[in-house]
Amino acid sequence: MAVSASPLGLEYVITAAKQRTGLSDFGDDSFRAPLKILLEALVEQADLNEAGTQGQSARIIEILCQRLLVQNFFNKYPEILTEEILNPVVIVGLPRTGTTMLHRALGSDQRFYTSRWFETRFPSPPTDWDFTGEDPRLSVAKAEIRGMLDANPDLAAMHPFDAEAAD
């Protein structure tokens, strides 16, 4: 199977993301070569069944959609790139070592701003949102978490999922 003709082909996923968002500016194209390598590896080495192929394709298309939305946001609000973040605190650690709890503890202090799960999962607000009312990303994130936990209730024991909490 030719990579370009499959759901894991570079042009397939890029075209799908453009069609889904109605956007076409990905910004810097440096992501394309590594993405092509990933897609080729998924086709040639991952031994995916049809569900796995469709799942990986959907995941990559969603990531590309987020890239398009973020670039669109930068294009609409270029002043974002001039914002200065003074004294950032970055939390890095291995899984299951308490990094989420540390993030949430620091986030409870008003001197810090922490990105919430839904903001991390969907970094750019929708292009048509006027910044009044509830952020539309929140309901999508809550539904996604609900779906993950419904599909695998054991996830709740591994990670404290909360769309509105720091993560």
Identify the function of each model-found stretch.
Residues V90-Q110:
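Glycine-rich phosphate-binding P-loop
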Residues M1-P78:
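Long, basic/Gly/Ser/Thr-rich N-terminal segments
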Residues E119-D167:
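PAPS-dependent sulfation machinery
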Residues S108-F118:
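Post-Walker A helix-loop "phosphate-sensing" segment adjacent to the P-loop in P-loop NTPases
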Residues S57, I61, L86-P88, T99, ...:
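Generic internal hydrophobic packing segments that stabilize the cores of diverse globular domains
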Residues E79-L86:
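Phosphate-binding P-loop
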